[in-house]
UniProtKB/Swiss-Prot annotation:
<dbReference type="GO" id="GO:0043709">
    <property type="term" value="P:cell adhesion involved in single-species biofilm formation"/>
</dbReference>
<dbReference type="InterPro" id="IPR050469">
    <property type="entry name" value="Diguanylate_Cyclase"/>
</dbReference>
<protein>
    <recommendedName>
        <fullName>Uncharacterized protein YtrP</fullName>
    </recommendedName>
</protein>
<dbReference type="GO" id="GO:1902201">
    <property type="term" value="P:negative regulation of bacterial-type flagellum-dependent cell motility"/>
</dbReference>
<dbReference type="InterPro" id="IPR029787">
    <property type="entry name" value="Nucleotide_cyclase"/>
</dbReference>
<dbReference type="GO" id="GO:0005886">
    <property type="term" value="C:plasma membrane"/>
</dbReference>
<dbReference type="Pfam" id="PF00990">
    <property type="entry name" value="GGDEF"/>
</dbReference>
<dbReference type="InterPro" id="IPR043128">
    <property type="entry name" value="Rev_trsase/Diguanyl_cyclase"/>
</dbReference>
<dbReference type="InterPro" id="IPR029016">
    <property type="entry name" value="GAF-like_dom_sf"/>
</dbReference>
<feature type="domain" description="GGDEF">
    <location>
        <begin position="449"/>
        <end position="577"/>
    </location>
</feature>
<dbReference type="InterPro" id="IPR000160">
    <property type="entry name" value="GGDEF_dom"/>
</dbReference>
<dbReference type="GO" id="GO:0052621">
    <property type="term" value="F:diguanylate cyclase activity"/>
</dbReference>
């Protein structure tokens, strides 16, 4: 009888192995269990051996983890086969018989192998599904479609969980999906979502709730909240799978964003090129500015367009093409503030809420961009709109680019003014002419409270010409002029007075400041000329209390210069009338 049982066990074992090796990968654990019970009854019918699940514990769906079946003896005719997840099976025979030795271990091994095969098959199916989802994500070129597909994929794959999205404000503005905005503070803020957004790491709130970042290569774009319904727990395996999908969607979202940005960049470049082409076809300033105004109004839906030119006296002049709002009133203090900001190096001004500037009934949004040519501020353009926050930052950057490219056309149209300016400049030293200096001084005497005039003479200049030649003399003049330009302010005026004499006018400064600047010049010329030369300087000044004519101002500086020459040169003298 024992030998017969051994033969039955061997035949059963062989049949079981054949089944495991030849069965389709689609055969489930439940199907394998049904085959096993039938085979046991067939091979061990004489012993009435049966394999039955515990009614309340039999689970057809595999649990997470690597729980394995093992057999434990209850008595000679009954064994309990169970795994760590709570699934139990009873292997039993007639009470007057014994379970064949080795059969419980063979059954446990079969169940483990069947469970492993189903797990591998399910994993393969899952990986294919994830691959298809990822492939679908990357086929989408719209940010909204990517996030919608992410929610649909998660909902279909994890039916026992609810999902919600947190999107940053700059992303939420252009997405038409149900998403919560990420608030940095306040009652609406979610500290867990914010922490995940800033760190880019997964964060568990409890056993059934977790926050998962949606991130690409360049940053985090949002946060996914997964929340179990009812008594559902969020296992580590599920969380890893959700994170895998979120990462795939994050990269696809980033690619879609870059694609949309590239399309916008191409459209902007086309707009800039077309604008530049049209503007450069025009010859007159009026035609150029009118065309530019139309393009600004169309591109940004601006209600008011203004163009300002800054002349050599820093006065604001309204250019053609400006709309009625700017024509009806003189430039206000605010426009002068814009000018000063741009003079200080600002690349533009962007105001989303202009009520503090124009009042509650005025314009709500403003953009201003400078017109710069060869590092010189020629003017600026202003766009206005009634609606608050009507201009986006992207529009602002495009506006800056358009004005930057249009400036060349505007500059060409203003060539006459530029040529007039060149006429006012000494060709050799690139300092202003004496006539322009006179004009500047007279203008300053009208609008300022004081001013300093400095007359400069290069000592022994005739000896330089006689010793080194007139070409070297010219080079000395250029070197001294360069020192002057590098030691005075942008609004000060350095001029070629005549021959080896140069002049400087410092508007709206006291004589003490003029003295310090002149001392610096005397030292700098001696150190920065080759061959080395020195200068003598005479200083005069005017104030509203001691009003002087231009002729008197020049005469006093000339007398002070003569005193410096008589006192040994290489020095400065202040006119005796100045105390």
């Amino acid at each position: 009888m024992v030998e017969q049982t051994k033969d039955q066990l061997s035949a059963f074992h062989y049949h079981m192995l054949d089944f495991l090796l030849t069965k389709s990968e689609k055969v489930t654990f439940t199907d394998s269990f049904i085959w096993l019970t039938s085979a046991i009854q067939t091979y061990f019918s004489t012993l009435c051996v049966s394999l039955t699940p515990s009614p309340s514990d039999f689970v057809t769906k595999l649990a997470d983890g690597e729980a394995r079946f093992s057999a434990s003896k209850i008595n000679a005719s009954c064994y309990l086969i169970e795994d760590g997840s709570g699934r139990r099976f009873h292997l039993a025979c007639r009470q007057d018989e014994e379970i064949p030795e080795g059969l419980p271990d063979v059954v446990a091994s079969f169940l483990n192998q069947s469970m492993k095969q189903e797990r591998l098959y399910n994993k393969t199916i899952y990986q294919k599904k994830i691959y298809k989802m990822t492939e679908l994500f990357h086929s989408l070129l719209d940010q909204t479609d990517v996030l919608k597909q992410l929610l649909e994929s998660l909902t279909s794959t994890f039916s026992l969980f609810e999902f919600s999205l947190f999107i940053s404000h700059d992303q939420d503005q252009c997405l038409g999906i149900p998403a919560k905005e990420l608030y940095m503070e306040g009652e609406k803020s979610d500290s867990f979502a914010l922490k995940v957004y800033l760190s880019g790491d997964i964060l568990r709130k409890n056993e059934s709730v977790a926050y998962i970042p949606i991130k690409g290569q360049q940053g985090t774009y949002g946060v996914l909240k997964a929340e179990g319904t009812g008594d559902s727990f969020l296992t580590d395996a599920c969380l890893d799978e959700m994170s895998l999908l979120a990462n795939a969607a994050g990269k696809a979202f980033e690619n879609a964003q870059l694609y949309e940005q590239s399309k916008a960049s191409i459209a902007n470049l086309e707009l800039i090129n077309e604008t530049s082409r049209r503007l450069n076809q025009r010859l007159t300033l009026t035609d150029t500015m009118n065309d530019l105004a139309v393009r600004m109004a169309e591109s940004f839906q601006a209600e008011e367009v203004g163009f300002f030119h800054i002349d050599h006296f820093e006065n604001l002049t309204l250019l053609p093409g400006s709309t009625a709002f700017f024509k009806e009133a003189k430039p206000s203090d605010f426009y002068n503030e814009l000018k000063e900001k741009l003079y200080e190096g600002e690349k533009g001004v962007f105001i989303g809420n202009g009520q503090s500037v124009f009042g509650k009934a005025g314009y709500g949004s403003l953009m201003a961009a400078p017109m710069i040519q060869n590092d010189r501020l020629l003017g600026f353009a202003v766009l206005l709109k009634q609606e608050l926050y009507a201009f986006t930052f992207e529009m602002y950057k495009l506006f800056q680019a358009l004005i930057h490219h249009a400036t060349l056309a505007v500059t060409n149209s203003m060539l006459r003014d530029r040529l007039e300016h060149l006429v006012k400049t000494d060709q050799l030293t690139e300092l202003y002419s004496r006539a322009y200096l006179d004009e500047k001084i007279q203008y300053s005497m009208k609008i300022h409270q004081k001013g300093v005039f400095i007359l400069v003479d290069i000592d022994n200049f005739k000896n330089v010409n006689d010793t080194y030649g007139h070409q070297t003399g010219d080079e000395i003049l250029i070197q001294v002029a360069s020192v002057i330009k590098s030691n005075i302010r942008k609004h000060d005026v350095g001029a070629r007075w005549g021959g080896e004499e140069l002049a400087i006018y410092l508007p709206n400064v006291p004589v003490a400041v003029g003295k310090r600047i002149t001392e610096r010049l005397v030292y700098a010329v001696r150190k920065n000329t080759k061959p080395e030369v020195t200068i003598s300087c005479g200083i005069s000044c005017w104030t509203t209390e001691t009003k002087k004519s231009l002729k008197e101002l020049v005469h006093e500086a000339d007398e002070a210069l003569y005193s410096a020459k008589r006192s040994g040169k290489n020095r400065l003298m202040i006119h005796d009338s100045i105390k």
